[in-house]
Amino acid sequence: MLTRIFIRDKLVLSKIRKGKEMLKNIICIILAWLQTAGFSVLNYLKPNETQTIGVNKFVEHQIFEGFGTSSAWWSQTIDNEETAREIARLLYDDETGLGLDIYRYNIGGGEKENPATRIGDVNRRTESFYVLNEKTGKYEYDFTRDANARRMLDMAVEYGAKEVILFCNSPHFSMTESGQASGGLTEYASNLPKENYAAFVDYVLTIADWFVEQGYPVTAISPINEPQWKWGGDWVGQEGCHYSADETVAVLELFALEMQKRNSPYKLSGPESGQLSPEYYEYIDKFFASDILNEFCDTYSGHSYWIDNNLWVKTDVGNKFAEQYPEKKLEMSEWCELPLKIDSTAIDSGLYMANIIAQDLNLMNAVSWQSWTAVNGDGLMELINGELVIYNRYYAYKHFASFIKPGMARIDIMDSLKGESKVVSTAFTDGKETVLVLINNEETSQLIDLYGSYSSTEMYLTDEMNNCNKIYSGNFFRETTLPARSITTIVLTK
């Protein structure tokens, strides 16, 4: 049983005005008691108040499965091999990069070769493996295509990507009602006719099987992406396809049945809900109400858009899963700042992203977390005039991805000033190391008194002057300071 102890300083100090040392001793006794109960305790000391955070190693939440990013829509634009290799290193190398685990490869809908395309941005017109043989009039597979994107995938795997997820934003344009992969001619109408469901299933699985045969670590396919959005009509900014909740289930059930027949060595991921909030719970409920999907799928994937810093919604999502689907997992498969307003080079952007990651891990119990785009203005870095510019979001992401590894468990944190402090924290452990990520959103520095039994400590800092720099490595010590508006990762070893 866990016991909270709160120290109300005004009351205590009024009784022992002449005994500051006595107060210090009382606090130390309390901290020692908490430690014997399985807590590690952090005190955030601000003028006239004490914030006590207990990290309880005995209360575990989700087992983490990995961090990642997506290949869309930048990987096909990287023509220079040296640049591609540098990007792969920065993203996936454990020693000198982020050490990401997951690479999301986009199976494009073929708008690059579609003469009827209405997508204006050429970078959002994808090249497909599924091409028309003009001599026979039939579609065939050509896996030499999408060469730049495939090279980026090769390098990501070479540098350490352990999982590849193949995802579609739309079926191939030749299978759609409108003849375009950018959605239907009217809003909120599915662009995939029922008579083409089976063809779409075969198309995705054929491509996935080819990647598996080539030795890629394909762990999942994700054939549907953000089904609830209107996709089509007058707005055709990218590839996409609307599905109602019932249509989503019908398509994914066919995938599950065919994958069972083929004994596919990868999972079915879906439906990549474009927003996780109560008005779209119908998609979750109907997904798991399907006997086929409930048996075949252990995870529901969604995107963390449009609910940034909405703690109520994220808590509700986490509670819903814990209460209604206790045997299922939630993965956060896509996020970027929408709309992009914050200067990507400023600490503000790093703090913003770090807070979103912590919210999704703590409140929604996400078992994995993946950013939408790695190389773009709203991504982790950007290629400008041939030079890679590393954004502050990259360093914020590093505070999580380089230290919280697959297999680690998120552990409980007890906070005496929950809801009142601007210091956000999350904690993970593998039993030997405990990783604390501390985000100080305050305009002032925060003194920490870290009470625990550890042999060594490493600390990494991002603020106005540091970019996830190691600022300490050595014997464990109790007191340190979180600089104003900063992200600190503390690695504690028993």
Regions found by a protein language model. Name each.
Residues 69, 99, 164, 221, ...:
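Conserved, mostly hydrophobic/aromatic
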Residues 473-494:
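C-terminal beta-strand-rich structural cap/linker in extracellular carbohydrate-active enzymes
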Residues 50-219, 223, 239-243, 249, ...:
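N-terminal catalytic cores of secreted or lumenal carbohydrate-active enzymes
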Residues 416-455, 485:
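Carbohydrate-binding surface patches
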Residues 5, 10-15:
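Short, positively charged and aromatic/hydrophobic N-terminal segments
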Residues 329-402, 412-416:
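Aromatic/acidic polysaccharide-binding cleft in carbohydrate-active enzymes
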Residues 452-467:
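Solvent-exposed beta-hairpin/edge-strand motifs
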Residues 202-206, 210-214, 227-335:
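Active-site neighborhood of glycoside hydrolase catalytic domains
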